[in-house]
C-alpha cells in the first residue's frame, strides 16, 4: 500500500478550485490552500484499501475489470495498466450502451474478430471498393472495441478515471448495479460510485500512482486464485 509521502510527491492531495467543488465531497476534503481544496490523504488510504480488498476478492472469484478513461493524456497510461493486469479497457470514447446494450456491443466485438480472422485469399475475391469498405469498417471497430476484444460477457467491475467526463459510464454502472471504482476529484459526486477514491484526477503522476496500486491488487487476486487451485490439486493428489 502507498504512503502519504508518496501521494504528496505525486500531487494526489491537490483538488480543484474551491468554487468548483461538489459539497458531497466535503468528508474527503482536509482544507483549502491558495484557492484550492486539499484532499484528506488519510481518507484516500482508507478508500484505496477498501477498493483493493474488493478487487482481490472479486478477481479470486474469476471476475475481470474494465478500465475506462477517455482523457487524451491518460489513455496510453490506462491502456498499459489494463494490459499489465489482464483487464479490458475503453480509452477512445464511451459508446452509449456498452453496458446497458450489451448484446449489440457483443455483436460489434464478434464482427471485429471475424474481420480480423479473414484470410488474404478471401480479400482477393473482393473488388477494390469492397476491400476499402471492409478496411474502414475494421479500423472503426478496432478503434472502439480493441480493448474489449476478449470480453465475452458484461464486466462485473468498472474502474473509472475522471467521473465528470465519463458520466455516461458512471450512469450505466449505477443503472445495472455494477460495482464501480472511481478516482474522484473535489468536483465529483461520491454517491454515484460504490468505491470512491478521493484523489487528483488531473495529474498524470497522481492517476498513475492510484492505477498502479489497483493493478497490483488485481494481479494479487489472480495469484491467490492460482495458488488456491494448486492447493486443491495437491490435496486431491494426496487423497488419490
Curated annotation (Swiss-Prot):
Could you tell me where this protein is found in the cell?
Answer: Plastid, Chloroplast
Q: Name one Pfam family in it.
A: Ribosomal_S2
Instruction: State whether keyword Plastid applies.
Output: yes
Any one cellular-component term (Gene Ontology): chloroplast
Give the matching SUPFAM superfamilies: Ribosomal protein S2
Question: Which keywords appear in this protein's UniProt record, sorted alphabetically?
Answer: Chloroplast, Plastid, Ribonucleoprotein, Ribosomal protein
A Gene Ontology biological process in which this protein takes part is: translation
Q: Which domain of life is it from?
A: Eukaryota
Any one Gene Ontology MF annotation carried by this entry is:
structural constituent of ribosome
Is the Ribosomal protein keyword given for this protein? yes
Q: Which PANTHER family match?
A: 30S RIBOSOMAL PROTEIN S2 PROKARYOTIC AND ORGANELLAR, SMALL RIBOSOMAL SUBUNIT PROTEIN US2M
Family per UniProt? Belongs to the universal ribosomal protein uS2 family.
- What is this protein identified as? Small ribosomal subunit protein uS2c
Amino acid at each position: 500500500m502507498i504512503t502519504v509521502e508518496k501521494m504528496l510527491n505525486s500531487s494526489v492531495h491537490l483538488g480543484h478550485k474551491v468554487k468548483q467543488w461538489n459539497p458531497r465531497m466535503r468528508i474527503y476534503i482536509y482544507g483549502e490552500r491558495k484557492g484550492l481544496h486539499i484532499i484528506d490523504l488519510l481518507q484516500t488510504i482508507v478508500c484505496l484499501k477498501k477498493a483493493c480488498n474488493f478487487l482481490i476478492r472479486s478477481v479470486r472469484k474469476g471476475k475481470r475489470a474494465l478500465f475506462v478513461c477517455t482523457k487524451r493524456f491518460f489513455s496510453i497510461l490506462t491502456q498499459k495498466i489494463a494490459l499489465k493486469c489482464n483487464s479490458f479497457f475503453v480509452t477512445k470514447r464511451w459508446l452509449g450502451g456498452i453496458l446497458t446494450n450489451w448484446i449489440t456491443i457483443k455483436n460489434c466485438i464478434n464482427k471485429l474478430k471475424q474481420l480480423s480472422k479473414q484470410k488474404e485469399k478471401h480479400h482477393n475475391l473482393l473488388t477494390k471498393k469492397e476491400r476499402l469498405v471492409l478496411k474502414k469498417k475494421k479500423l472503426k471497430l478496432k478503434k472502439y472495441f480493441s480493448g474489449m476484444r476478449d470480453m465475452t460477457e458484461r464486466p462485473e467491475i468498472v474502474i473509472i478515471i475522471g467521473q465528470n467526463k465519463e458520466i455516461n459510464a458512471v450512469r450505466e454502472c449505477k443503472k445495472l448495479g455494477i460495482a464501480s471504482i472511481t478516482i474522484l476529484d473535489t468536483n465529483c459526486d461520491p454517491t454515484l460510485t460504490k468505491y470512491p477514491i478521493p484523489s487528483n484526477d488531473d495529474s498524470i503522476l497522481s492517476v498513475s500512482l492510484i492505477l498502479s496500486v489497483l493493478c497490483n491488487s488485481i494481479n494479487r487476486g489472480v495469484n491467490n486464485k492460482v495458488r488456491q487451485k494448486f492447493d486443491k490439486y495437491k490435496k486431491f493428489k494426496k487423497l488419490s
